């Protein structure tokens, strides 16, 4: 266990124990920005950090996670969750952006890493543009020790927004980019 204040880092009471932190919300809600903030703090604390993103996410850079506000941190592109496991052995902290694109194996990989004593932080969409669960994020939420739910701002009325609004009617469930 530990404490989690929305404006601070989750803290663990037992040193060396692993944990899973999940950051979810709609598009433009600051998920990646929060992930980068936590990973930078871990780096400042001289912890070994490995950062991953799906190869599908090539919006800003192939070798970095980049927020919409253009914060960036170097990362490794992976095709699936199993590749995360291959490259995470030396790390104390593992960051994963756009977790919804890494498939059902993400849940098992995160559990394995946490059992190895690692702090695992995953950011991603928990719902698609139709407000339906975006697998595997709901399963990850079910096992997470710490959950942060971010809110966007509606550009029409200025109210907090918890849904992704799709502006284009093309494509399937996944359309990469700011649409």
Where are the model-predicted features located?
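Conserved GTP-binding G-domain of TRAFAC-class P-loop NTPases and closely related GTPase folds
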Residues: 139-179
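Short, Lys/Arg-enriched N-terminal segments with co-localized hydrophobic residues
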Residues: 1-6
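Catalytic-core regions built around general acid/base machinery
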Residues: 38, 109-116, 136-143
